[in-house]
Amino acid sequence: PKFLDEVKTLKMGDPLREETRLGPMIDEQSAQRIESWVTEAVNEGAVLSYGGGRKGTLYEPTILTKTTPQMKVNTNELFAPAVTVSKHDTFEEAVRRINDSAYGLQASVFTNNIRHVFYAYEHLEVGGVIVNDVPSFRADNMPYGGVKDSGVGREGVRYAMEEMTEPKLLVLNLS
């Protein structure tokens, strides 16, 4: 209930307005993509617990429950204001479910249990583990990037400089 209450407070709209917390998708095609994936999940038995509406490129924050591992909303990177919530008997089972993906950008773990924090860090197949914050959290000096099909390399000032330059070597033998 607390998560749902927080999601309900998100103001959607013009990103230039101070009260806006959720701006538009990058383009119409991206908004249509997430809309179709959510609709497909619901048609396959998922429960739309909140959201799911779209006005142009604005897509409501969306919570899906009772999804299956095979649904597109679980097998693809959403890059949208949508989340699937699953119940698991153990923390380890939840980590296995997360790893059962071709992707591994970043993951969030919401816990006060330090054992869970270190277990997640050791076992999650992702480029970064964020504890008690959103998975998109980053600072410019942090390496940001994924593993598996989420890409290679890292972003961040240092990493961007290395990626955007081409080293060149000169060996001069004057003998």
Residue ranges with predicted function:
Residues 1-69, 131:
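ALDH superfamily catalytic-core signature
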